[in-house]
Amino acid sequence: MKPLHTPKPAQIWVDADACPAVIRDILFRAAARTGTALTLVANHSLSTPTLPHVRAIQVPGGPDAADDAIAERVAAGDLVVTQDIPLAARVLEAGATAVGPRGEPFTSNTIKERLSVRGFMEELRGAGIATGGPSALHARDRQAFAAQLDRWLAAQPRPPL
């Protein structure tokens, strides 16, 4: 007997405006291997492989346009790849999982502190104090991201054969 409601399979959303190409490549390979839906959202044109479950959405330019598009579409259980802390907070509120391109998970236990630190750093920059940017992406960052992605994929229910 079939269940009355078949839950929609979880999918992966990517805040692609600032997502490194090497991380996108990891995501493309995972989507090809697993058949998981992958959607990249950016305010510029994106090149994606020709796979039936990979798509790109181009949103109008403007602050937070890609973030808003993801937040409006994300569902509980989905995975969102983003460096944007406010977007990660919105994703967590929706019941989805958020992870940064370095493999760092955003959690309900850490998001408030991360928002606080972000606000403090913005104040410093507003006062003219140089705060620097993130360091270059290293092999260990790519490995940490791939490990987080694999954990999320392994936790997803597989359709019966």
Curated annotation (Swiss-Prot):
Pfam family for this entry, one: DUF188
Domain of life: Bacteria
Family classification: Belongs to the UPF0178 family.
Protein name: UPF0178 protein XOO2722
